[in-house]
């Protein structure tokens, strides 16, 4: 995620802009539309308890992850709920031959004339059409569920959304590129002090004690989430030749294109190029898979990726949100339909993009967070950058709910979801012969490790003790409402995110950001999974409970802070803190721990 970039990662934060109300017009009552009934999810609490059990190394059920199809079966609606909704539709005169039940998605779809749908949903509910985009939606959007089915149904929405408008690219965060002062000399990693100017792959391996890889288990490619920012293979070849000569020329990610996205081309910000250059030298000879998604100017993130790796998500809880997610076909772009369940997800996925929580709806965040839980239940490790603007989030602070004249801290999603591992950033300082890893602090680029507390997601049990210990000893005593003390706390860990060697457009520069740290940590986990698979074990899966139970596998980061919103932010301190999480990994100890687990 970026922020400072000496090129870097994009903190993908876009703000969705509402279309003028005058562009929305009522649809004719005779037009037939497709509607969707989203069932209640009574097993969500049960699913979370199951995840906490099978990811707890002290549990007898540790590692008993489910197949994705088993997860889908777990969430299907009850037979009684299905029968009640079908009876409601039949009583309303709906032709049941038009009904399609997506059990794994907990959604039932049906066709109805607009006039009849309005009567079914109650007075004042209309189907609206947007002349500019071709989209359809129900208004009011917060209409009530009919009383006959309110105990079984979460909400009812449209199952179709047309779009013919042309998308326009915009970026909320602009990267900064730092060039190295000439003449640039490749540092010799036998002494880390030689690495202070530019951290090459060899320097990074030396810092964390990572040996070169020698083996590659089958079906263990590391996943990278790509987001409309292509890379040039020529840059990779030059980077391998200069900084990772053990990687052969021509080595590049396996591309899984989603909804027509292009993976190779002229970079926009260089984010995906950075992800590849940070991860490949650690995972090689394992491979890297790029799940390439198109840029989304409507403000949402990653739903198209989740659709592509889990068909049930396409319609889960009413499907993707047309207010935030693209709809197909796109004028001048991908003609659709949107991909559903086309690819198998990798054991590890690294995500260097994020969005301010406050720019998304609560439903959007909760729906997607449930899907990250489903992937965790199936044994997938998801690593997400925590952000590069300290407690600010990406673009701006939010408003204090207790005092509108004061600001409040912001968090980034999806790192604020408790079912992913959020990664912060550090830098290395040298005092004489001493190497000291501290929280990144770069006022020049306004780059500070993203951290704090979610305003949308509750604090999970696995981190409550660590958070309570931190606040008991380091309470910043900010005004009430400055941060959500009961929210999911981030980050979980932190790694080097400053002055990393980066090559783009044939030029070696330095880069940074939590988007540099995240693929590094993901690559470490992928390496460890490789050893587990070769030993006949399963991938390690959801990491967070293990990490919080084993502070001995981390270097505790106790110096630094993450200012923002006209405050000093939080301070790094002993134990977990909302700047560096549990600290930076001691790879040999982390490897020994994770390989030893059943």
Q: Can you name each region flagged by the protein language model?
A:
Residues 19-99, 109, 114-392, 396-423, ...:
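Substrate-binding/charge-relay-adjacent region of secreted/lumenal peptidase catalytic domains
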